[in-house]
Amino acid sequence: MLLTKKVLWYFRHGIEYQIRSIACKKGYSEHNVSRVLIEKARSLSSEYLQFHQVNNKDQSAMTNDTDLAKRIARLRRVHNAYSKFKSLSEQISDLKQMEAQESDAEVKMMAVTEINEISNKIPKSIEDLENTLLPQADSYALPALIEIRPGVGGTEAAIFANELVEMYFQYANFKGWNCKFISKSAVQGLEAITEAIFSIEGEGAYGHLMLEGGVHRVQRTPATETKGRVHTSTASVIVLPQVSNDESSSLYDSSEVKIEVMRSRGAGGQHVNRTESAVRLTHIPTGITVSMQDSRSQHQNKEKAFLVLNSRLAALNAAKENEAERLKRKNQVTSSDRSEKLRTYNFNQNRVTDHRIGLSMHDLSTFMQGEEKFDEFLEKIRIWNREQLLLHSEIV
C-alpha cells in the first residue's frame, strides 16, 4: 500500500505540526501555544520535581507549611498534565522517526495509523494542561447580570444603548438562555433607554459575557443630522456574576444594608403618587446604592434590588481578590468617556472593531443580530484573554 506525499508530509512534521494545527483551530497563535503554554508547564513541572525531591527528605517542611502544601498540590496537577502531554508528544516523535526510516510500505502505514490515533488525544491533553495553569473561577458558570447605560452623546447614546440591549437579548436567545429585565427606563417616544438592568440565565453565561464589560462606542450619522456629519456616542456595559438572594449570606450581614421605601417618581398616573413602592438599598460599608421602582409591588422591587446589590458586591469582592490583574487589564467600566473605548461600531463603514485585540469585522448589521457571527467574535476575544492570562499567570 502506497502512502500519498501529502500524508507523509503531514506526519514528518511531528508534534510541532500538531500544535500548529490545534492552534489554528482554537484561534491561538503557534507562538503562544507552543512557547508560552509548553514552556510554562515545563518550568512548573521542573519546580514540582525539585519540591518533591526536597520534601521526600524532609516531610515536616510541607506538613507545617499549609501555603507550601497548597502550592505543591497545584504544581502536582500541572506536572501530571504536562507529563501526559509530553508522553504523547514523545510517542508521536518516535513513530515519526520510525516512519521516516522504514522502507516497508505496510509498516509505514501502521506507524501513520498509530500516529493518527495518538494525535487525536493531543487537543484534550492541551485543554487539560491549560485548565491546570488557568483554572476557571466558580463565577464563570454563574448567570450574568448586565447593566447598560448611555454615556456621551445625548439621545444618540440612549438609542445606541437600547440597540446593545437588543443585541444581547438576541444572543441569549441564540444560545438558548433565558433573558429577562430586572429594570428598564425607556425614553418616551423613542427606541432608547436611560438605563437597563437584565439577567441572562444559562450555564456559563457570565463566563461567556464577562469580557463585554466596558465602554462601547458608536460612530454614525444620526437621522436628525442635516449636514451628514458623523457623530460619536458611547454606552457603558457592566457584566456581573449573578448571585441569588439565597446565596447572599456570605456577602454581607443584613444589618449592613439600609432599606428605604418611597413613592415612585416615574410616569404612571395617580398610582405613582399614592403608593410607596420604590425601594432604595444602601450597603453601608461600601456606600453602594441600588434603587428600584420598575414594579408596582414594593416586595418585587425589593427582591430585584437585592439581586442587583448581591451581584455588585460579589463583583467587588472578586475585584479585590484580583486587584493586580484587574489594574493590568482595566476590563471594567470606570466612566463612559470616549477615550476608554473597548469596541467601536462604525455604521457608515459597516465595521465593528474590538480595540483590545485589533479585531475587525466588516458586517456590522449581521454582528448586531447577536447570532453566529457575534458568537464567533466573542470566542476570539475569550481566546485572546486566555493567551494574556497564560503570559502573566503565576502559580501561587
UniProtKB/Swiss-Prot annotation:
Example GO BP: mitochondrial translational termination
Keyword Methyltransferase: no
GO terms for MF: translation release factor activity
GO cellular component assignments: mitochondrial inner membrane; mitochondrial matrix
SUPFAM superfamilies: Release factor (SSF75620)
Major subcellular site: mitochondrion
N5-methylglutamine: residues bearing it: Q270
Localization per record: Mitochondrion
Keyword Glycoprotein: no
UniProt-listed PROSITE patterns: RF_PROK_I
Post-translational modification comment from the UniProt entry: Methylation of glutamine in the GGQ triplet is conserved from bacteria to mammals.
Gene3D superfamilies, per database record: 3.30.160.20, 3.30.70.1660, 6.10.140.1950
Superkingdom of origin: Eukaryota
Keywords: Methylation, Mitochondrion, Protein biosynthesis, Transit peptide
InterPro entries: PCRF (IPR005139), Pep_chain_release_fac_I (IPR000352), Pep_chain_release_fac_I_sf (IPR045853), Prokaryotic/Mito_RF (IPR050057)
Family: Belongs to the prokaryotic/mitochondrial release factor family.
PANTHER family assigned: LD18447P
Name assigned to this protein: Putative peptide chain release factor 1, mitochondrial
Higher taxonomy: Eukaryota, Fungi, Dikarya, Ascomycota, Taphrinomycotina
